[in-house]
Structure formats: structure tokens, C-alpha cells
């Protein structure tokens, strides 16, 4: 129904924003990934959108990129996955990480996201593999650089989890750090993540 919205960013919370378009304020639920891409409050913002319609609810979801919205819609096709869980996945992992987990049949990469257990992770991979492959066939052949980055991220996450930190908190911190500084070593990522977690 709505492809996208462009307007003034009037309110910003960790999981939702309000965008004013022609005098009408629209509330969007967003992922942590989209939150990181937002401009300053009061600036113009562009969000791709998805409208969830239920008997007692009309809820808009906003995305900084088309790929994220596309994956959100695919996740909703999975048995047992609703908007809340789909958004949690997109907050805890990058679009590419979820694609890689699906295409390489590694459900353990999805563990740790609130609400995602072994059965749910297995269903996501089983039900979405062909759909993700059609969307991005090149992703099936992960480049050495991307594989290296994925292994580095997993090593950093696993190391921090062994120190007693929550996997979902660690994943969010590590993903954010690698997005900003993709050239870091595992040790540097761990140190930066520890600082980020303690400061949050």
C-alpha cells in the first residue's frame, strides 16, 4: 500500500520513530540496523515501509534500505515468525549475515536472537533458502573476503559469550563495530565490543 515515506524525523526512540509528512505524523517500528542509519532528529528522512494489517491493528514498519524490507517480508512468510521476531532478527544480525546463514545451512548463526530457538532457525532456513537464492543467487557463492569477515565476527561473538555476556547483546555490538570498522582484527573487535557493552 505504501512503498516509502519521505518527511521530517520528529521523534526517535530505540525501536520506533515518527515521521511527519504533509502535516500527518506516521509511527514506524524499526530495527537496530535502521536506527543506526537515521539522520539527526528534525532532519529529512527516507524510509521504505511495510504495513501490517490485522483486525485490531494497523502498524507501519520502516527500513533504511530495500534489502532489509525485502528480507523482513520473506521472514514473515516463515511459519511461526511474526513482525516482532522478524524485526528482532534484523536488529541482531545484518541482512547479509541472515542470507549467509540461510544459504550455507548454518542455523546456529541465528541462535541467541530472542525468540529464535533451534526449531525456528531450522524452519527459517528450510522455508526461505530457495526464496533467498532467487533474490540473490550470487550470495550462494560467498566471496573469501565475506567468509573471512563472517568467521571473524563469529570468533569475536563466541569469545565474548564465553566471558559471560548475552549472545544477542554481543552480536549487536560486534555487528555495529564491524559495520563502522571492517578492517579490525578479532582482538580489536573484542576490545571495542567490551567498551561498547560497558558504555551502553
Swiss-Prot record:
* Flexible linker: region residues: 144-154
Where does it reside?
Answer: Cytoplasm
Q: Which residues cross the membrane?
A: none
Keywords attached to this entry: Cytoplasm, DNA damage, DNA recombination, DNA repair, DNA-binding
Alphabetized InterPro entries for the sequence: DNA_helicase_Holl-junc_RuvA_I, Hlx-hairpin-Hlx_DNA-bd_motif, NA-bd_OB-fold, RuvA, RuvA_2-like, RuvA_C, RuvA_C_sf
> Which family does this protein fall into?
Belongs to the RuvA family.
Protein name per its UniProtKB record: Holliday junction branch migration complex subunit RuvA
User: Which gene does this sequence derive from?
Assistant: ruvA
